[in-house]
Amino acid sequence: MTTMQLDSDGRLRHLLTLEGLPRATLLQLLDRAGQIRDAAVGRVGKRSVLAGTAVCTLFFEPSTRTRSSFHLAAQRLGADVLNFDASTSSTRKGETARDTLKNLEAMGVRGFVVRHPEDGAVERLAEAAGEGTALINAGDGRSAHPTQGLLDMLTLRQAKGTDFSKLKVVIVGDVKHSRVARSDLHALRTLGAGEIRVCGPASLLPDDDMLDGCVVGEDFDAMLEGADALMMLRLQRERMEEGLVPSLEQYHADYGLTRERLARAGRDAAVLHPGPINRGVEITDEVADGAQSCVLRQVANGVAVRMAVLETLLG
């Protein structure tokens, strides 16, 4: 898939996954996003980098943060933004996602931000895209969510510095169903994170090679010791079978992040969550809204990251 993302000169053509993405490309995107974020602090400007370029948010799954973030990012670069709603489109009449893309492409749309419930769906659409058309994966099934991975890495850089070699990161919760966890794991490995710990009930941990090289365990309290950053994951109840967790109350008792548990982690440990948060399940209000929470910073960084990606692909 990495080959499809890059053209013959090594330039990014699509952003489908962070798996196998060259370190230099990853750093280039993060550096550019950081520049955009720094320039935007205290003001919201509009640029003309993508003036005259049409970008479509092609979402076949519900979204609030990601869709709004991409819309704002494209607007701030001067693009014309078309929001596609699957519930009111010809897909209800049987039109395939591929035909939808090709028809919009024929109208002059050059950039597609795609979210889809099926694993690998965005890659298949990228194979069908014409020359000069760029696709960005905004989350497909359990496979990947590359811009979330990028904004998480940008948030970690801001909180902990650019050298990840001594960083101890704990990813907690429903790893099995999480495309965010997959993208974060690929990015952390590429950036040379010192130690990646993965914690959750056995029923919510993947049984493939996704966790190779990670410290894996079910004891949340033990995993927290000395951690520099905690990535709390949402329970993907829409993707999981019944009975994978006994109850939400029991899950919170075992894996919910409370102020008392946070005290076990390293001093000033950063707390991240991709949202939407199930308050009182993955994380308490006190922690979500506390001084160590980076949740809203992640949201703010999302616009900068998506501007950097759109600019790189279409500018």
From Swiss-Prot:
Residues annotated for L-aspartate binding in this entry: K93, R179, R234
Origin superkingdom: Bacteria
InterPro entries, alphabetized: Asp/Orn_carbamoyltranf_P-bd, Asp/Orn_carbamoylTrfase, Asp/Orn_carbamoylTrfase_sf, Asp_carbamoyltransf, Asp_carbamoyltransf_Asp/Orn-bd
Protein's GO biological process: 'de novo' pyrimidine nucleobase biosynthetic process; 'de novo' UMP biosynthetic process; amino acid metabolic process
Pathway it works in: Pyrimidine metabolism; UMP biosynthesis via de novo pathway; (S)-dihydroorotate from bicarbonate: step 2/3
The name this protein goes by in its record: Aspartate carbamoyltransferase catalytic subunit
Similarity section: Belongs to the aspartate/ornithine carbamoyltransferase superfamily. ATCase family.
A Pfam family it matches: OTCace
UniProt KW Lipid biosynthesis keyword: no
Subunit structure: Heterododecamer (2C3:3R2) of six catalytic PyrB chains organized as two trimers (C3), and six regulatory PyrI chains organized as three dimers (R2).
Organism: Xanthomonas campestris pv. campestris (strain B100)
EC number, as in UniProt: 2.1.3.2
UniProt keyword terms in alphabetical order: Pyrimidine biosynthesis, Transferase
Keyword Transferase included in the entry's annotation: yes
GO CC entries: cytosol
Known function: Catalyzes the condensation of carbamoyl phosphate and aspartate to form carbamoyl aspartate and inorganic phosphate, the committed step in the de novo pyrimidine nucleotide biosynthesis pathway.
Binding site for carbamoyl phosphate: R65, T66, R115, H145, Q148, G275, P276
UniProt GO MF annotations: amino acid binding; aspartate carbamoyltransferase activity
PROSITE patterns, alphabetized: CARBAMOYLTRANSFERASE (PS00097)
Reaction(s) catalysed by this chain's protein: carbamoyl phosphate + L-aspartate = N-carbamoyl-L-aspartate + phosphate + H(+)
